Amino acid sequence: MYENFYAVIMAGGSGTRLWPLSRKHQPKQSLRIAGDRTLFQYAVDRLEGLFPHERIMVVTVADQVDMLHGEYPEIPVENFIIEPLPRGTASVVGLACVALKHRDPNATMAILTADHLIRNDAHLRQLLRAAHAVAQEDVLVTLGITPSYPATGYGYIQKGEPFGDYEGLETFDVNRFKEKPREAQAQVMVADGQHVWNSGMFIWRVDAVMGEIERQMPDLYDKLEKISDAWLDETKMDTLANVWPMIDPQTIDYGIMEQAQQVVVIPSVDLGWNDVGSWESLFESIDGDAAGNIVLRGDPITFDTQGTLICGDSSEHLIVTIGVEDLIIIDSGDAILVCDRKHAQRVRDVVNYLKKQGREDYL
């Protein structure tokens, strides 16, 4: 039933908002910040029972292939698809489609990420089974997250008319995708019960999404066709190198989903999802101690400290806090970050500043 169902894990990002732990040599998906395994390993682990390793594809950049394959050698190395340059998630989808249509013309793919936290693996597999069934109706499918609070850091999806029940789950036509809202708007959307968070996980038949790319992004489609024509011969890498830089960067949401002819959303019931988009979002996903503090690593000493996230580098660096609250303290060995949790999103500004200053050793 699922022999034509493939998981495509996007694993090429760097996660600049988790600096100073996330760096060029150790991107976000290779961090051990939620247990003993990396985020990438957890992303593969949770697919067990639905996708054999032979049907798990990984899209990443060339200098991360060896690292990721080393973390999960059971995935065949030929299943790693190399993205020559960052050109947005729409082009990643297109490249994965090219690879899969040569392997299995009847393929259905689940677009997943390597750097999210999901606590309820069984529910994810239920959602994916339901999405696979819906996708056979030649529609595009996205997974929605039932909001637990009025988040301003996520996009929202407005549910429309019911589409049907699949695998015991309700599905809905999508009325519209909405940008990350201001807090007042987020409160209204959460209260009305008609909106879910956009998880960034998508399921569709390869031919269906390629049809949407051809209709909405004809320039990208033409370039993908050139790449496809060379995919199985010795000119593949040269063609990729020549064509890929000419692709205009675009996201899945803007490039494909917002104007697609029909999109169906499946709201999660209790997925335990977090996109780990910042130190603050990681803090929100982990239970703290009696004082609300979370220690990811190390053995700090805390006096009169509340609501603080601490990650030490080693036993040689002792972190001591006195009379503070709502801080993020990260020691990576060569850099220390101290910031108010409310300003966690601004860590990306630090990375941009370091780039402008040419301080490559800290990137």
Residue ranges of each PLM-predicted region?
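General beta-strand structural signal in soluble alpha/beta enzymes
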Residues: 58, 82, 111, 142-145, ...
